[in-house]
Amino acid sequence: MQERHTEQDYRALLIADTPIIDVRAPIEFEQGAMPAAINLPLMNNDERAAVGTCYKQQGSDAALALGHKLVAGEIRQQRMDAWRAACLQNPQGILCCARGGQRSHIVQSWLHAAGIDYPLVEGGYKALRQTTIQATIELAQKPIVLIGGCTGCGKTLLVQQQPNGVDLEGLARHRGSAFGRTLQPQLSQASFENLLAAEMLKTDARQNLRLWVLEDESRMIGSNHLPECLRERMTQAAIAVVEDPFEIRLERLNEEYFLRMHHDFTHAYGDEQGWQEYCEYLHHGLSAIKRRLGLQRYNELAARLDAALTTQLATGSTDGHLAWLVPLLKEYYDPMYRYQLEKKAEKVVFRGEWAEVAEWVKAR
Protein backbone atom coordinates (compact mmCIF):
# COMPACT_ATOMS: atom_id res chain seq x y z
CA MET A 1 0.00 0.00 0.00
CA GLN A 2 1.27 3.45 -0.93
CA GLU A 3 2.35 6.03 1.59
CA ARG A 4 3.10 9.72 1.05
CA HIS A 5 5.93 11.03 3.17
CA THR A 6 8.07 13.65 1.41
CA GLU A 7 7.67 17.43 1.33
CA GLN A 8 6.99 17.33 -2.40
CA ASP A 9 4.42 14.58 -1.90
CA TYR A 10 2.60 16.72 0.65
CA ARG A 11 2.64 19.75 -1.63
CA ALA A 12 1.39 17.65 -4.54
CA LEU A 13 -1.56 16.49 -2.41
CA LEU A 14 -2.52 20.09 -1.67
CA ILE A 15 -2.08 21.31 -5.25
CA ALA A 16 -4.20 18.46 -6.61
CA ASP A 17 -6.94 18.91 -3.99
CA THR A 18 -6.49 15.23 -3.19
CA PRO A 19 -9.41 14.04 -1.03
CA ILE A 20 -8.19 13.32 2.49
CA ILE A 21 -10.15 10.95 4.73
CA ASP A 22 -9.24 12.40 8.11
CA VAL A 23 -9.85 9.83 10.87
CA ARG A 24 -9.06 12.15 13.80
CA ALA A 25 -11.79 12.98 16.30
CA PRO A 26 -14.16 15.85 15.40
CA ILE A 27 -12.63 18.16 18.02
CA GLU A 28 -9.20 17.77 16.41
CA PHE A 29 -10.64 18.31 12.93
CA GLU A 30 -12.41 21.50 14.02
CA GLN A 31 -9.17 22.92 15.42
CA GLY A 32 -7.41 22.53 12.08
CA ALA A 33 -7.84 20.55 8.87
CA MET A 34 -6.71 20.48 5.27
CA PRO A 35 -8.96 22.05 2.60
CA ALA A 36 -9.94 18.81 0.83
CA ALA A 37 -10.39 16.76 4.01
CA ILE A 38 -13.55 15.01 5.14
CA ASN A 39 -13.86 13.93 8.75
CA LEU A 40 -14.73 10.26 9.24
CA PRO A 41 -13.30 9.59 12.69
CA LEU A 42 -12.10 6.30 14.08
CA MET A 43 -13.19 7.52 17.52
CA ASN A 44 -15.59 10.26 18.52
CA ASN A 45 -14.59 12.93 21.04
CA ASP A 46 -15.69 10.97 24.11
CA GLU A 47 -14.03 7.76 22.96
CA ARG A 48 -10.80 9.61 22.21
CA ALA A 49 -10.85 11.25 25.65
CA ALA A 50 -11.40 7.91 27.37
CA VAL A 51 -8.54 6.28 25.46
CA GLY A 52 -6.28 9.24 26.25
CA THR A 53 -7.01 8.99 29.96
CA CYS A 54 -6.39 5.24 29.87
CA TYR A 55 -3.07 5.80 28.11
CA LYS A 56 -1.88 8.21 30.80
CA GLN A 57 -2.96 5.95 33.65
CA GLN A 58 -2.29 2.45 32.32
CA GLY A 59 -0.08 2.74 29.25
CA SER A 60 -0.32 2.12 25.52
CA ASP A 61 -1.38 -1.54 25.55
CA ALA A 62 -4.36 -0.88 27.80
CA ALA A 63 -5.32 2.18 25.76
CA LEU A 64 -5.19 0.20 22.51
CA ALA A 65 -7.32 -2.55 24.03
CA LEU A 66 -9.87 0.01 25.22
CA GLY A 67 -9.97 1.60 21.77
CA HIS A 68 -10.76 -1.75 20.15
CA LYS A 69 -13.42 -2.39 22.78
CA LEU A 70 -15.07 0.99 22.21
CA VAL A 71 -14.99 0.73 18.41
CA ALA A 72 -16.46 -2.73 17.96
CA GLY A 73 -19.58 -4.47 16.74
CA GLU A 74 -22.21 -2.23 15.19
CA ILE A 75 -20.18 0.95 15.82
CA ARG A 76 -17.20 -0.45 13.95
CA GLN A 77 -19.43 -1.66 11.13
CA GLN A 78 -21.08 1.75 10.73
CA ARG A 79 -17.70 3.45 10.53
CA MET A 80 -16.37 0.81 8.14
CA ASP A 81 -19.36 1.42 5.88
CA ALA A 82 -18.62 5.16 5.90
CA TRP A 83 -14.91 4.63 5.13
CA ARG A 84 -15.68 2.13 2.39
CA ALA A 85 -18.15 4.50 0.74
CA ALA A 86 -15.67 7.39 0.96
CA CYS A 87 -12.87 5.29 -0.53
CA LEU A 88 -15.04 4.18 -3.44
CA GLN A 89 -16.23 7.75 -4.01
CA ASN A 90 -12.66 9.09 -3.81
CA PRO A 91 -10.42 6.44 -5.38
CA GLN A 92 -7.52 8.91 -5.61
CA GLY A 93 -7.79 9.89 -1.95
CA ILE A 94 -5.63 9.22 1.07
CA LEU A 95 -6.03 8.47 4.79
CA CYS A 96 -4.78 10.81 7.48
CA CYS A 97 -4.66 10.91 11.28
CA ALA A 98 -2.76 13.18 13.66
CA ARG A 99 0.79 11.95 13.06
CA GLY A 100 0.42 8.99 10.71
CA GLY A 101 0.32 6.67 13.70
CA GLN A 102 -2.01 3.99 14.95
CA ARG A 103 -5.36 5.46 13.96
CA SER A 104 -4.71 5.75 10.22
CA HIS A 105 -2.83 2.43 10.20
CA ILE A 106 -5.71 0.68 11.98
CA VAL A 107 -8.27 2.05 9.52
CA GLN A 108 -5.96 1.17 6.62
CA SER A 109 -5.60 -2.42 7.87
CA TRP A 110 -9.35 -2.82 8.36
CA LEU A 111 -9.98 -1.56 4.84
CA HIS A 112 -7.31 -3.91 3.50
CA ALA A 113 -9.04 -6.84 5.19
CA ALA A 114 -12.25 -5.74 3.45
CA GLY A 115 -10.50 -5.77 0.07
CA ILE A 116 -9.70 -2.05 -0.23
CA ASP A 117 -6.09 -0.90 -0.47
CA TYR A 118 -5.91 2.79 0.38
CA PRO A 119 -2.77 4.90 1.00
CA LEU A 120 -2.10 7.04 4.03
CA VAL A 121 -0.15 10.19 4.83
CA GLU A 122 2.98 9.13 6.67
CA GLY A 123 3.39 11.88 9.24
CA GLY A 124 -0.32 12.67 9.27
CA TYR A 125 -1.92 16.06 9.72
CA LYS A 126 1.12 17.34 11.62
CA ALA A 127 3.34 16.81 8.56
CA LEU A 128 0.80 18.44 6.25
CA ARG A 129 0.47 21.37 8.65
CA GLN A 130 4.22 21.91 8.67
CA THR A 131 4.12 21.83 4.87
CA THR A 132 1.50 24.59 4.70
CA ILE A 133 3.44 26.75 7.17
CA GLN A 134 6.68 26.33 5.24
CA ALA A 135 4.99 26.88 1.87
CA THR A 136 3.49 30.18 3.03
CA ILE A 137 6.85 31.38 4.34
CA GLU A 138 8.50 30.46 1.04
CA LEU A 139 5.84 31.79 -1.33
CA ALA A 140 5.41 35.04 0.61
CA GLN A 141 8.97 35.97 -0.40
CA LYS A 142 7.82 36.69 -3.96
CA PRO A 143 7.05 40.36 -4.76
CA ILE A 144 3.57 41.60 -3.86
CA VAL A 145 1.34 44.31 -5.31
CA LEU A 146 -1.52 45.43 -3.08
CA ILE A 147 -4.83 46.75 -4.38
CA GLY A 148 -6.05 49.61 -2.20
CA GLY A 149 -8.98 51.98 -2.28
CA CYS A 150 -12.00 53.13 -0.32
CA THR A 151 -14.92 50.85 0.48
CA GLY A 152 -16.88 49.97 -2.66
CA CYS A 153 -14.03 50.41 -5.15
CA GLY A 154 -14.22 46.80 -6.29
CA LYS A 155 -10.83 45.77 -4.92
CA THR A 156 -11.82 42.16 -4.27
CA LEU A 157 -13.24 41.70 -7.77
CA LEU A 158 -10.08 43.13 -9.29
CA VAL A 159 -7.93 40.68 -7.31
CA GLN A 160 -10.20 37.78 -8.26
CA GLN A 161 -9.77 38.54 -11.95
CA GLN A 162 -5.96 38.38 -11.84
CA PRO A 163 -4.35 35.01 -12.61
CA ASN A 164 -1.82 35.76 -9.88
CA GLY A 165 -4.42 37.11 -7.45
CA VAL A 166 -5.33 35.49 -4.14
CA ASP A 167 -8.65 36.53 -2.61
CA LEU A 168 -7.80 36.75 1.09
CA GLU A 169 -11.32 37.81 2.06
CA GLY A 170 -12.87 34.96 0.12
CA LEU A 171 -10.59 32.46 1.85
CA ALA A 172 -11.37 34.03 5.24
CA ARG A 173 -15.12 34.04 4.47
CA HIS A 174 -15.28 37.64 5.63
CA ARG A 175 -15.09 40.98 3.81
CA GLY A 176 -12.98 42.63 6.45
CA SER A 177 -15.34 45.36 7.69
CA ALA A 178 -18.01 45.68 10.37
CA PHE A 179 -20.48 44.49 7.71
CA GLY A 180 -18.07 41.85 6.43
CA ARG A 181 -19.60 38.60 7.65
CA THR A 182 -20.98 36.11 5.14
CA LEU A 183 -23.41 33.24 5.61
CA GLN A 184 -20.50 30.82 5.82
CA PRO A 185 -18.89 30.56 9.27
CA GLN A 186 -15.22 31.44 9.39
CA LEU A 187 -12.73 28.60 9.62
CA SER A 188 -10.43 28.00 12.57
CA GLN A 189 -7.16 29.91 12.31
CA ALA A 190 -5.18 26.79 11.38
CA SER A 191 -7.72 25.74 8.73
CA PHE A 192 -7.66 29.25 7.24
CA GLU A 193 -3.87 29.18 7.06
CA ASN A 194 -3.94 25.73 5.46
CA LEU A 195 -6.48 26.91 2.88
CA LEU A 196 -4.41 30.01 2.12
CA ALA A 197 -1.24 27.95 1.66
CA ALA A 198 -3.02 25.50 -0.64
CA GLU A 199 -4.39 28.37 -2.74
CA MET A 200 -0.96 29.96 -3.01
CA LEU A 201 0.61 26.63 -3.98
CA LYS A 202 -2.03 26.02 -6.66
CA THR A 203 -1.74 29.54 -8.05
CA ASP A 204 2.05 29.34 -8.15
CA ALA A 205 1.95 25.92 -9.83
CA ARG A 206 -0.42 27.21 -12.54
CA GLN A 207 1.37 30.45 -13.25
CA ASN A 208 4.97 30.02 -12.11
CA LEU A 209 4.24 33.58 -11.06
CA ARG A 210 6.59 36.49 -10.57
CA LEU A 211 4.45 38.43 -8.10
CA TRP A 212 1.28 38.21 -6.03
CA VAL A 213 -1.74 40.50 -6.35
CA LEU A 214 -3.50 40.86 -2.99
CA GLU A 215 -6.01 43.23 -1.46
CA ASP A 216 -4.62 45.78 0.99
CA GLU A 217 -5.86 44.14 4.19
CA SER A 218 -5.31 44.81 7.85
CA ARG A 219 -3.87 42.04 9.99
CA MET A 220 -7.33 40.75 10.96
CA ILE A 221 -10.00 39.60 8.51
CA GLY A 222 -12.94 38.97 10.80
CA SER A 223 -11.73 36.44 13.36
CA ASN A 224 -8.86 35.19 11.20
CA HIS A 225 -5.47 36.86 11.10
CA LEU A 226 -2.97 36.78 8.27
CA PRO A 227 0.15 34.67 8.81
CA GLU A 228 2.87 36.91 10.18
CA CYS A 229 5.29 36.08 7.36
CA LEU A 230 2.75 37.26 4.76
CA ARG A 231 1.61 40.27 6.76
CA GLU A 232 5.20 41.44 7.15
CA ARG A 233 5.78 41.22 3.39
CA MET A 234 2.53 43.10 2.73
CA THR A 235 3.68 46.03 4.87
CA GLN A 236 6.60 46.43 2.46
CA ALA A 237 4.60 46.01 -0.76
CA ALA A 238 3.76 48.52 -3.50
CA ILE A 239 0.15 49.72 -3.53
CA ALA A 240 -2.09 50.49 -6.51
CA VAL A 241 -5.09 52.57 -5.40
CA VAL A 242 -8.50 52.35 -7.06
CA GLU A 243 -10.23 55.75 -7.13
CA ASP A 244 -13.70 55.25 -8.59
CA PRO A 245 -16.48 57.88 -8.58
CA PHE A 246 -18.63 57.90 -5.45
CA GLU A 247 -21.79 56.96 -7.39
CA ILE A 248 -20.16 53.82 -8.80
CA ARG A 249 -19.04 52.81 -5.33
CA LEU A 250 -22.60 53.20 -4.06
CA GLU A 251 -23.89 50.95 -6.84
CA ARG A 252 -21.39 48.25 -5.92
CA LEU A 253 -22.21 48.47 -2.23
CA ASN A 254 -25.94 48.35 -2.93
CA GLU A 255 -25.46 45.19 -4.96
CA GLU A 256 -23.12 43.50 -2.48
CA TYR A 257 -24.51 44.42 0.92
CA PHE A 258 -28.23 44.91 0.29
CA LEU A 259 -29.41 43.03 -2.80
CA ARG A 260 -27.03 40.07 -2.57
CA MET A 261 -27.11 39.66 1.20
CA HIS A 262 -30.91 39.86 1.25
CA HIS A 263 -31.03 37.22 -1.48
CA ASP A 264 -28.53 34.99 0.32
CA PHE A 265 -30.33 35.18 3.66
CA THR A 266 -33.76 34.43 2.19
CA HIS A 267 -32.33 31.62 0.07
CA ALA A 268 -30.75 30.06 3.16
CA TYR A 269 -33.53 30.63 5.71
CA GLY A 270 -36.72 31.29 3.76
CA ASP A 271 -38.51 34.61 3.33
CA GLU A 272 -39.58 35.35 6.91
CA GLN A 273 -36.56 34.18 8.88
CA GLY A 274 -34.24 35.30 6.08
CA TRP A 275 -35.59 38.83 6.36
CA GLN A 276 -35.02 38.85 10.12
CA GLU A 277 -31.47 37.54 9.68
CA TYR A 278 -30.78 40.21 7.04
CA CYS A 279 -32.06 42.99 9.31
CA GLU A 280 -30.01 41.66 12.22
CA TYR A 281 -26.92 41.47 10.00
CA LEU A 282 -27.17 45.17 9.06
CA HIS A 283 -27.94 46.29 12.61
CA HIS A 284 -25.08 44.22 14.00
CA GLY A 285 -22.67 45.81 11.50
CA LEU A 286 -23.71 49.32 12.48
CA SER A 287 -23.66 48.48 16.18
CA ALA A 288 -20.09 47.21 15.87
CA ILE A 289 -18.87 50.76 15.19
CA LYS A 290 -21.21 52.52 17.62
CA ARG A 291 -18.39 53.73 19.86
CA ARG A 292 -16.47 55.23 16.96
CA LEU A 293 -19.54 56.96 15.55
CA GLY A 294 -20.62 58.35 18.90
CA LEU A 295 -23.96 57.52 20.48
CA GLN A 296 -25.91 60.42 18.97
CA ARG A 297 -24.75 59.79 15.40
CA TYR A 298 -25.19 56.05 15.80
CA ASN A 299 -28.80 56.52 16.94
CA GLU A 300 -29.50 58.80 13.96
CA LEU A 301 -28.08 56.31 11.46
CA ALA A 302 -29.80 53.36 13.16
CA ALA A 303 -33.14 55.16 12.81
CA ARG A 304 -32.43 55.74 9.10
CA LEU A 305 -31.53 52.06 8.75
CA ASP A 306 -34.85 51.06 10.32
CA ALA A 307 -36.71 53.36 7.94
CA ALA A 308 -34.82 51.95 4.95
CA LEU A 309 -35.66 48.39 5.99
CA THR A 310 -39.33 49.30 6.36
CA THR A 311 -39.31 50.72 2.82
CA GLN A 312 -37.42 47.75 1.42
CA LEU A 313 -39.86 45.29 2.98
CA ALA A 314 -42.85 47.20 1.64
CA THR A 315 -41.59 48.01 -1.87
CA GLY A 316 -38.47 45.94 -2.52
CA SER A 317 -36.47 49.12 -3.11
CA THR A 318 -33.06 49.49 -1.47
CA ASP A 319 -32.76 53.20 -2.31
CA GLY A 320 -33.65 54.19 1.24
CA HIS A 321 -30.39 52.73 2.51
CA LEU A 322 -28.50 55.62 0.93
CA ALA A 323 -29.77 57.84 3.76
CA TRP A 324 -27.48 56.08 6.23
CA LEU A 325 -24.87 54.57 3.90
CA VAL A 326 -23.75 57.87 2.35
CA PRO A 327 -22.98 59.59 5.67
CA LEU A 328 -21.39 56.39 6.98
CA LEU A 329 -18.97 56.41 4.05
CA LYS A 330 -18.26 60.14 4.11
CA GLU A 331 -17.96 60.51 7.88
CA TYR A 332 -16.41 57.20 8.88
CA TYR A 333 -15.10 54.75 6.28
CA ASP A 334 -13.55 57.16 3.77
CA PRO A 335 -11.71 59.33 6.34
CA MET A 336 -10.48 56.20 8.11
CA TYR A 337 -9.09 54.69 4.91
CA ARG A 338 -7.48 57.94 3.79
CA TYR A 339 -5.81 58.28 7.18
CA GLN A 340 -4.46 54.73 6.92
CA LEU A 341 -3.26 55.34 3.36
CA GLU A 342 -1.47 58.55 4.33
CA LYS A 343 0.71 56.55 6.72
CA LYS A 344 2.00 54.46 3.81
CA ALA A 345 1.88 57.09 1.06
CA GLU A 346 5.43 56.28 -0.04
CA LYS A 347 4.25 52.77 -1.00
CA VAL A 348 1.63 54.06 -3.49
CA VAL A 349 2.92 53.55 -7.04
CA PHE A 350 -0.27 53.99 -9.09
CA ARG A 351 -3.72 55.58 -8.84
CA GLY A 352 -6.63 55.32 -11.22
CA GLU A 353 -10.16 54.13 -11.79
CA TRP A 354 -10.92 50.41 -11.62
CA ALA A 355 -10.22 49.60 -15.28
CA GLU A 356 -7.01 51.64 -15.25
CA VAL A 357 -5.68 49.85 -12.18
CA ALA A 358 -6.66 46.49 -13.68
CA GLU A 359 -4.71 47.32 -16.83
CA TRP A 360 -1.72 48.52 -14.83
CA VAL A 361 -1.65 45.33 -12.77
CA LYS A 362 -1.96 43.19 -15.88
CA ALA A 363 1.19 44.80 -17.29
CA ARG A 364 3.32 43.99 -14.24
UniProtKB/Swiss-Prot annotation:
Matches recorded under PANTHER family: TRNA 2-SELENOURIDINE SYNTHASE
Statement: the UniProt record of this protein carries the keyword DNA damage: no
Enzymatic class: transferase
Catalytic machinery residues: C97
Pfam family, one: Rhodanese
UniProt-recorded Gene Ontology molecular function terms: transferase activity, transferring alkyl or aryl (other than methyl) groups; tRNA 2-selenouridine synthase activity
Catalytic activity: 5-methylaminomethyl-2-thiouridine(34) in tRNA + selenophosphate + (2E)-geranyl diphosphate + H2O + H(+) = 5-methylaminomethyl-2-selenouridine(34) in tRNA + (2E)-thiogeraniol + phosphate + diphosphate; 5-methylaminomethyl-2-thiouridine(34) in tRNA + (2E)-geranyl diphosphate = 5-methylaminomethyl-S-(2E)-geranyl-thiouridine(34) in tRNA + diphosphate; 5-methylaminomethyl-S-(2E)-geranyl-thiouridine(34) in tRNA + selenophosphate + H(+) = 5-methylaminomethyl-2-(Se-phospho)selenouridine(34) in tRNA + (2E)-thiogeraniol; 5-methylaminomethyl-2-(Se-phospho)selenouridine(34) in tRNA + H2O = 5-methylaminomethyl-2-selenouridine(34) in tRNA + phosphate
Protein function: Involved in the post-transcriptional modification of the uridine at the wobble position (U34) of tRNA(Lys), tRNA(Glu) and tRNA(Gln). Catalyzes the conversion of 2-thiouridine (S2U-RNA) to 2-selenouridine (Se2U-RNA). Acts in a two-step process involving geranylation of 2-thiouridine (S2U) to S-geranyl-2-thiouridine (geS2U) and subsequent selenation of the latter derivative to 2-selenouridine (Se2U) in the tRNA chain.
Gene name for this UniProt entry: selU
Assembly with partners or alone: Monomer.
Record EC number: 2.9.1.3
Statement: the UniProt record of this protein carries the keyword 4Fe-4S: no
PROSITE patterns: RHODANESE_3 (PS50206)
GO BP of this protein: tRNA wobble uridine modification
HAMAP family: tRNA_sel_U_synth
Lineage: Bacteria, Pseudomonadati, Pseudomonadota, Gammaproteobacteria, Enterobacterales
UniProt entry keywords in alphabetical sequence: Selenium, Transferase
Family membership: Belongs to the SelU family.
Protein name: tRNA 2-selenouridine synthase
Domain Rhodanese intervals: 14-137
